[in-house]
C-alpha cells in the first residue's frame, strides 16, 4: 500500500498504436470477466489484513530524466471503512497535500516456471474513485523478448463505490482486453505496447534493483521506453493468495503475441465456451504468410492451455477502419491439421471479396492485393467431433488424401464376408442338392457385446448371388441386411461387385483378386424444385429513393438532398444544417401506413446510400437486413404509428443489384422519357454549401466528366442555354434528385413488365439479378428431381475445390499487330452445349472405372502435366504473391471435373484417380439458353429486350455455386446488444453513431431457409468453359500474348471457322493493336491500328478507376518497372455514417505470380514460362534469368532490375 505521485508526461518514440475494438465487443469482454462486488471487498479486506500482520516492506525508487516522476512513500496501513457495502479506505491517514494523488494498490507477484517474477498492479485513486493504473511485466528468457504494458485510468468507480464488473484479474486477460477496458471509460487515453529485444539482457541480470537506473542511462533506448510508470519490486516479495478462491495468476510465456493470464477455477468452467485469440501484429498484406504466422501462434497457445483434440476456429480480419470480417466460416480442426486450416483460409482469402462495405472500397483492390489489418481467432474446444453442428461444414481438404479403409473386410459386428464369388471358399456354407440355394449360420455381437445367431439364406443365380441375413427375436424373424454379389459380364468369381443393403442404405464394393478396388455409397439429397408462375406483378409496390451528397473540407461525403417517389407523389428534402436530424425528419414522412408494403429501390444502396440511411432508420423501428458478402441487399423496417398498435413495414432494395449498370446507361437502354440529367456536383463541395446561390451556371470544371459518363464542353454549352443568369441552386438540385427517382421508377416498371410478360415472374419478390434469373429458370425450364440441392454438407466444400475461374495469364509482355478475340457468350455456350451433373451423387473410394465404364462427375486425381508452353489444367499453389490459381507443368493433386481431365489427355496429360463423386448426365440448360438467345437475336441492340436477354444469359450459372453458409444480420439497441453479446458465440459488430449496433452472426444454413444451391453445376460450367478456351490456347500457343477468361490476344488471325460476330461459342474479332504491352494479368493497353469506338488507344487496369494513358503503362514495362499513381478511393464507414474520399497511391509494376518471368541480356522481360510443380510444390525459379549468348552479366543486371 503506497501513496504514489505520478507526474504527467507524454509518450515519446511511439512504436505503434494499439487498434481498439468496438464498443459492442468491449461489452462482450466485460460480461465474460465479471466478478461480484462483495467477493472483491472480502478479498481486499483479507489482503490488507494479511499485509498488516506480516508488516510487508517494499523497496522504492524514483524516476527522472524526462521519463516521468515516480515517488513511492511508505504509509501506515489504513483500516478499511465499509459504507453501504461500498469499500473506501479511510482518507485521514494520508497527507492532505497528496490527497489528489493517493492510490491504493493491490499487487500480486507470481514466479514463473523460468524463475522470473511477474507483477500485476491494480490501483484505486482515493479521490477520483477510479482504478488508476494496471501494469504487467512479462519476461520470456527462451525467446529473449521483453514486454511492458501500461494502462492508465482504467475503470470508473460508480456511486462513490467500486464498480468491479471489469476490475479483478480475469480468467484469461491480454493486452487487447486491458486496452478495451481502458478506452471504455477513457476514449482519449493512449495505450502502448513496447517490444524491445535490446533490453532483454537487463532482465537476465540477477540484480533487478538497478533496472530503472540502467534504463535511464541508455540513451539509445530512452526514446522508446514507456514514460508513464514502471513498477519495480523486490526479488523476495512473496506471492499473494487472495480470498477463499486462492486466485493465482498463471504466467504464460509468449513471444510476439498478447500476454494472457487465466485462473485455474474459471478455466474449467468455460472450457467448452468460446475463447478469443487476438494477434498483436498489424499487416499491410494479410495473405497466406500472415495466416501461417498467426495460426502457428494460435495452435501453440491452444496446445499450452487445452487438451481437447478437436476445436472449431473462426478467423477474422480487423480492418484499419475498426470493422471486422470473417474469413470463410467455422472450421473444425485438430493440432495435427494446421496446414489444412491454413490452406482452407487461404482459399477464402483468394476467392472471397474480403474488401467490402465493412472495410475498403473495391476500387483499391487488384489481383495481387490482400486486405490490411490484424487477425483474431474465436475458437471453441469440442467434446467430440461426432454430433456437433460444425462437423457438417468443415473443410477437410488435403492434398495428400488417402483412402484409409478401402481394403478392409465387410465387417458387421464380427461378420466377415469373403472377397470372392467362389463359393468353395465360403466357410459354413451349406448348399442344397441342386446348388441353387444355400444357408449360412454365423454368430455376431451387438453393440453391448452380446452374441447372437444369424442365418443367411443364399439364392444362387447365373453370375449373381443374393444372401439375406435374418435373426430370430421373440418368435419373429427380423431382416438385418442383404448382400448381392454379381460378376456382370466378366464370369470371373474374383472380379465382382457386392451390394450391401442395410436399413434402406446401400454400399457397393468392387473386388478384384481378393482386394477392394472401389467402394461406392449413395449421397442422398433433396432436389431443387420448380416454383409456380406469378399471375401478376406488383407494380404498385415499386417506389424509388435517391440521395445526393457533397464533400466537406475533410473529404467526407455528407447528404444534402433526398427525394423519394412512392408511385404517386414526389417528396424532396434539402439538408442545410444538421443532416442527420433533417434526414430523420424526412424519413418520418415516409413511414406512413399508406406506404406499407412498398419497396423503395435505391440505385447503389449496397455500396453507397446504405452507409447514410442505416443508422437513421434504426432510430425509427426494427431493422431486418439481408446482406451477402457484406453488401446490404435489402433493409426492411417494421414500425408503428403513434396511437396505433398495428405494425407496418417498408423495404429498401438495391436496384443496381438487379440492373448492374449506371442510371445514365439504363435510361438509354430502356429508352425512357425521364432520362438522367446533369448537375455541377463539384459546386457543392467545400466548407459551406451554396444553397442560396442564384446566378450564372457554375463553370464547366464543376461538372463530372468520366469515361463512364461523358459530359463534353458542347454538352455544357447546351446546358447553359436553358438559363439566363437565373440558375437556382436549390431548384436545380431538387430537380436533379427528383429526375433520378422518376427515371429509376420508369426503368424498374418497364423491366418488371417485360420480365413478367415473357416469363411470368414478379421481380419485386427478389433482391438481385441472379435471384431473378434463378426464379425464371425454376419457373419455366427446371426439370423435376434432377438437380441435387447440396447445401450445408461436406460435399459442397469438397466439390468447391473443383470450382475455379477461367484462364487469366500473360505469356508475352509486348508485341505489334496484336489481334483481340472474345468468345460470344462463353458461359452460356458451355451451358447450352454440355451435359451437367444431375441426379443422386455416388461417392466412390478408389478408381471409378472399376465401377462403371463411363464415369461422369468429379474426381480427386494426381495429375501429371506435359511440358506445354500453355498448360490447361489449373491448381492452387502457394506463390510469392499468396495462394494463386495457376496452370503449371509437373505433378499435382486436386479435385476436377473428369471430362476436363479427359479433354487434357489428348494433349499429353495423365492422371490417377483415388476418389470420385459420380452423377447422371443431363443437358438442363439448352432450352433456357436457346430461348434467351432467340430473344436477343430478335431485337436490335438499342431495344430493352436485347439488353435484358443479354443480362439473363450471363447471370444464372454462378447462382448454383452460392455458399450455403449464410449470415444473419440485425440492428439492436445498446441494451439489447449487451444481452445479445452475453449469449452469442460468433459475433462481429459495428457500433453506429446512435449507439445502436449492427450484428453479424455466422449461422448454418439449416437455421434459416433452403438456399437451393448445387456447386457441381457451377463447377461444371466453369470447367466446360475452360475446355472451350483450351482449344485456342493449345492451337495458338506460339502466338499467344494474354488470355482473360473468354478472350485471347494473339499476333495472328485465327482460323475463320472459329470466327463469327454472333454465333454462340465462336470467337468475335474485336480490334487490332498496332502495338501493345501486357504488364500483368488484367493489366494491359495498346494503340489501335484504326479508331475503335471513337478511341485511338485503350488501357485496362484492374482495380484502377481513374483512366491512365497508354504511354504511362508502357513506361511501367519499358523503363522503371514500377510506377505510382494517385487515385481516389471511397472508404465507407458505417460506424460514422459517412464515406471518406481518400487519395491513395496505386503501384503499377510488371508482375507475375502465376508464371515464370523470362529476361534477356538487358534485364528486360521478354516472355514467361509455366511454373513447374513436383507434388504440389514449386520447383522452378519464380524469376528465370536467361540470355541467348550465355552472357554472364545478364544475370547480375536482371537480378538488380528485379
Curated annotation (Swiss-Prot):
The UniProt GO MF terms for this protein read: DNA binding; DNA-directed DNA polymerase activity; nucleotide binding
Asked if the record carries the keyword Glycoprotein, the reply is: no
Q: Specify the protein name.
A: Probable DNA polymerase
Q: Which Pfam families match?
A: DNA_pol_B_2
Species of provenance: Ascobolus immersus
Per the UniProt record, which EC number(s) apply here? 2.7.7.7
Other facts: This DNA polymerase requires a protein as a primer.
A GO BP entry: DNA replication
Q: Where in the cell is it found?
A: Mitochondrion
Q: Which PROSITE patterns match?
A: DNA_POLYMERASE_B (PS00116)
**Catalyzed reactions:** DNA(n) + a 2'-deoxyribonucleoside 5'-triphosphate = DNA(n+1) + diphosphate
Q: Does the keyword Transferase apply?
A: yes
GO CC annotation: mitochondrion
Amino acid at each position: 500500500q503506497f501513496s504514489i505521485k505520478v507526474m504527467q508526461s507524454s509518450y515519446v518514440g511511439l512504436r505503434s498504436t494499439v487498434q481498439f475494438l468496438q464498443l459492442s465487443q468491449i461489452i462482450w469482454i466485460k460480461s465474460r470477466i465479471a466478478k461480484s462486488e462483495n467477493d472483491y471487498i472480502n478479498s481486499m479486506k483479507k489482503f490488507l489484513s494479511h499485509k498488516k500482520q506480516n508488516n510487508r516492506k517494499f523497496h522504492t525508487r524514483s524516476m527522472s530524466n524526462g521519463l516521468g516522476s515516480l515517488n513511492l512513500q511508505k504509509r501506515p496501513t489504513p483500516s478499511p471503512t465499509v459504507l453501504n457495502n461500498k469499500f473506501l479506505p479511510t482518507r485521514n491517514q494520508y497527507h492532505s497535500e497528496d490527497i489528489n494523488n493517493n492510490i491504493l494498490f493491490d499487487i500480486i507477484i507470481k514466479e514463473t516456471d523460468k524463475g522470473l517474477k511477474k507483477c500485476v498492479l491494480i490501483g484505486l485513486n482515493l479521490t477520483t474513485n477510479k482504478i488508476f493504473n494496471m501494469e504487467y511485466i512479462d519476461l520470456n528468457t527462451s525467446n529473449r523478448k521483453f514486454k511492458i504494458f501500461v494502462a492508465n485510468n482504467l475503470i470508473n468507480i460508480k456511486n462513490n463505490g467500486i464498480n468491479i464488473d471489469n476490475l479483478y484479474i480475469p480468467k484469461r486477460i491480454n493486452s487487447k482486453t486491458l486496452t478495451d477496458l481502458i478506452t471504455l471509460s477513457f476514449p482519449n487515453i493512449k495505450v502502448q505496447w513496447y517490444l524491445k529485444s535490446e533490453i532483454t539482457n537487463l532482465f537476465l541480470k540477477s540484480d533487478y534493483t538497478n533496472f530503472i537506473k540502467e534504463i535511464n542511462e541508455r540513451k539509445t533506448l530512452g526514446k522508446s521506453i514507456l514514460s508513464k510508470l514502471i513498477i519495480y519490486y523486490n526479488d523476495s516479495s512473496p506471492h499473494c493468495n487472495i480470498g477463499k478462491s486462492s486466485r493465482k495468476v498463471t504466467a504464460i510465456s509468449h513471444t510476439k503475441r498478447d500476454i494472457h493470464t487465466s485462473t485455474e477455477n474459471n478455466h474449467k468452467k468455460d472450457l467448452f465456451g468460446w475463447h478469443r485469440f487476438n494477434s498483436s501484429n498489424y499487416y499491410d498484406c494479410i495473405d497466406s504468410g500472415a495466416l501461417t504466422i498467426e495460426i502457428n501462434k494460435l495452435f501453440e497457445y491452444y496446445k499450452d492451455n487445452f487438451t481437447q483434440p478437436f476445436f472449431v476456429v473462426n478467423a477474422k480480419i480487423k480492418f484499419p477502419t475498426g470493422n471486422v470480417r470473417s474469413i470463410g466460416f467455422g472450421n473444425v480442426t485438430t493440432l495435427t491439421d494446421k496446414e489444412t486450416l491454413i490452406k482452407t483460409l487461404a482459399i477464402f482469402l483468394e476467392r472471397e471479396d474480403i474488401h467490402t462495405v465493412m472495410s475498403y472500397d473495391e476500387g483499391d483492390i487488384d489481383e495481387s492485393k490482400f486486405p490490411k489489418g490484424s487477425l483474431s481467432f474465436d475458437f471453441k474446444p469440442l467434446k467430440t467431433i461426432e454430433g456437433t453442428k460444425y462437423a457438417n461444414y468443415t473443410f477437410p481438404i488435403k492434398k495428400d488424401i488417402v483412402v484409409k479403409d478401402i481394403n478392409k473386410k465387410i465387417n458387421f459386428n464380427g461378420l466377415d464376408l469373403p472377397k470372392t464369388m467362389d463359393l468353395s471358399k465360403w466357410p459354413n456354407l451349406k448348399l442344397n442338392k441342386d446348388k441353387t440355394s444355400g444357408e449360412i449360420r454365423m454368430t455376431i455381437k451387438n453393440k453391448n457385446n452380446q452374441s447372437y445367431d444369424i442365418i443367411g439364406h443364399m439364392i444362387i443365380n447365373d453370375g449373381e448371388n443374393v444372401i439375406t441375413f435374418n435373426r430370430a427375436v421373440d418368435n419373429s424373424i427380423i431382416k438385418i441386411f442383404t448382400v448381392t454379389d454379381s460378376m456382370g459380364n466378366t464370369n470371373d468369381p474374383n472380379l465382382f461387385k457386392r451390394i450391401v443393403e442395410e436399413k434402406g442404405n446401400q454400399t457397393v464394393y468392387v473386388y478384384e483378386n481378393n482386394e477392394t478396388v472401389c467402394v461406392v455409397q449413395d449421397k442422398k439429397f433433396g432436389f431443387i424444385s420448380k416454383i409456380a408462375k406469378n399471375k401478376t406483378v406488383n407494380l404498385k409496390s415499386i417506389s424509388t429513393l435517391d440521395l445526393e451528397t457533397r464533400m466537406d473540407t475533410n473529404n467526407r461525403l455528407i447528404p444534402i438532398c433526398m427525394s423519394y417517389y412512392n408511385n404517386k407523389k414526389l417528396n424532396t428534402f434539402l439538408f442545410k444544417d444538421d443532416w442527420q436530424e433533417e434526414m430523420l425528419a424526412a424519413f418520418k414522412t415516409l413511414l406512413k401506413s399508406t406506404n406499407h408494403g412498398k419497396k423503395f429501390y435505391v440505385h447503389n444502396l449496397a455500396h453507397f446510400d446504405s452507409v447514410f440511411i442505416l443508422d437513421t432508420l434504426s432510430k425509427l423501428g426494427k431493422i431486418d437486413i439481408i446482406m451477402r458478402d457484406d453488401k446490404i441487399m435489402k433493409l426492411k423496417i417494421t414500425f408503428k404509428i403513434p396511437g396505433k398498435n398495428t405494425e407496418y413495414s417498408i423495404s429498401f432494395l438495391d436496384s443496381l443489384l438487379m440492373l448492374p449498370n449506371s442510371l445514365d446507361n439504363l435510361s438509354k437502354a430502356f429508352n425512357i422519357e425521364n432520362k438522367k440529367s446533369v448537375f455541377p456536383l463539384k459546386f457543392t463541395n467545400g466548407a459551406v454549401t451554396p444553397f442560396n446561390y442564384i446566378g450564372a451556371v457554375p463553370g464547366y470544371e464543376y461538372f463530372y466528366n468520366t469515361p463512364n459518363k461523358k459530359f463534353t464542353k458542347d454538352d455544357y454549352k447546351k446546358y447553359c442555354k436553358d438559363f439566363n443568369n437565373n440558375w437556382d441552386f436549390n431548384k436545380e438540385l431538387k430537380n436533379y434528385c427528383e429526375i433520378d427517382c422518376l427515371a429509376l421508377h420508369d426503368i424498374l416498371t418497364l423491366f418488371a413488365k417485360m420480365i413478367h410478360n415473357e416469363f411470368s415472374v414478379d421481380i419485386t419478390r427478389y433482391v438481385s439479378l441472379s435471384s431473378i434469373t434463378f426464379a425464371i429458370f425454376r419457373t419455366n425450364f427446371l426439370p423435376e428431381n434432377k438437380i441435387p440441392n447440396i447445401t450445408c454438407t461436406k460435399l459442397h466444400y469438397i466439390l468447391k475445390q473443383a470450382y475455379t475461374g477461367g484462364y487469366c495469364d500473360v505469356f508475352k509482355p509486348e508485341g505489334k499487330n496484336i489481334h483481340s478475340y472474345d468468345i460470344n457468350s462463353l458461359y452460356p455456350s458451355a451451358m447450352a452445349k454440355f451435359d451437367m451433373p444431375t441426379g443422386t451423387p455416388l461417392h466412390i473410394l478408389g478408381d471409378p472405372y472399376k465401377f462403371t465404364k463411363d464415369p461422369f462427375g468429379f474426381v480427386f486425381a494426381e495429375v501429371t502435366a506435359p511440358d506445354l508452353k500453355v498448360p490447361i489444367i489449373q491448381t492452387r499453389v502457394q506463390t510469392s504473391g499468396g495462394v494463386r490459381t495457376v496452370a503449371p507443368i509437373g505433378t499435382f493433386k486436386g479435385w476436377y471435373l473428369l471430362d476436363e481431365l479427359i479433354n487434357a489427355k489428348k494433349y499429353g496429360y495423365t492422371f490417377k484417380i483415388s476418389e470420385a463423386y459420380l452423377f447422371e448426365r443431363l443437358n438442363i440448360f439448352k432450352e433456357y439458353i436457346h430461348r434467351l438467345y432467340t430473344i436477343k437475336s430478335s431485337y436490335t441492340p438499342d431495344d430493352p429486350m436485347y439488353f435484358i436477354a443479354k443480362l439473363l444469359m450471363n447471370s444464372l450459372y454462378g447462382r448454383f455455386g452460392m455458399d450455403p453458409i449464410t449470415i444473419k444480420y440485425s440492428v439492436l439497441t445498446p441494451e439489447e446488444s449487451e444481452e445479445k453479446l452475453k449469449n452469442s458465440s460468433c459475433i462481429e459488430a459495428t457500433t453506429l453513431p446512435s449507439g445502436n449496433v449492427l450484428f453479424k452472426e455466422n449461422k448454418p444454413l439449416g437455421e434459416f431457409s433452403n438456399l437451393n444451391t448445387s456447386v457441381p453445376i457451377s463447377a461444371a460450367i466453369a470447367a466446360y468453359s475452360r475446355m472451350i478456351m483450351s482449344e485456342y490456347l493449345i492451337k495458338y500457343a506460339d502466338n499467344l500474348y494474354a488470355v482473360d477468361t473468354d478472350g485471347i490476344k494473339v499476333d495472328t488471325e485465327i482460323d475463320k471457322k472459329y470466327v463469327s460476330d454472333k454465333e454462340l461459342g465462336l470467337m468475335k474479332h474485336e480490334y487490332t493493336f498496332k502495338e501493345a504491352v501486357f504488364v500483368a494479368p488484367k493489366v494491359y493497353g495498346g494503340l489501335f491500328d484504326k479508331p475503335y469506338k471513337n478511341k485511338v488507344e485503350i488501357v485496362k487496369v484492374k482495380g484502377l478507376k481513374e483512366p491512365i494513358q497508354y504511354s504511362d503503362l508502357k513506361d511501367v514495362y519499358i523503363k522503371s518497372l514500377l510506377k505510382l499513381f494517385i487515385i481516389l478511393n471511397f472508404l465507407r464507414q458505417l460506424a460514422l455514417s459517412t464515406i471518406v474520399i481518400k487519395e491513395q497511391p496505386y503501384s503499377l509494376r510488371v508482375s507475375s505470380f502465376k508464371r515464370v518471368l523470362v529476361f534477356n541480356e538487358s534485364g528486360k522481360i521478354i516472355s514467361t514460362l509455366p511454373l513447374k510443380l513436383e507434388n504440389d510444390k514449386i520447383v522452378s525459379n519464380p524469376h528465370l534469368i536467361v540470355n541467348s549468348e550465355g552472357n554472364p552479366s545478364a544475370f547480375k543486371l536482371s537480378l538488380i532490375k528485379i
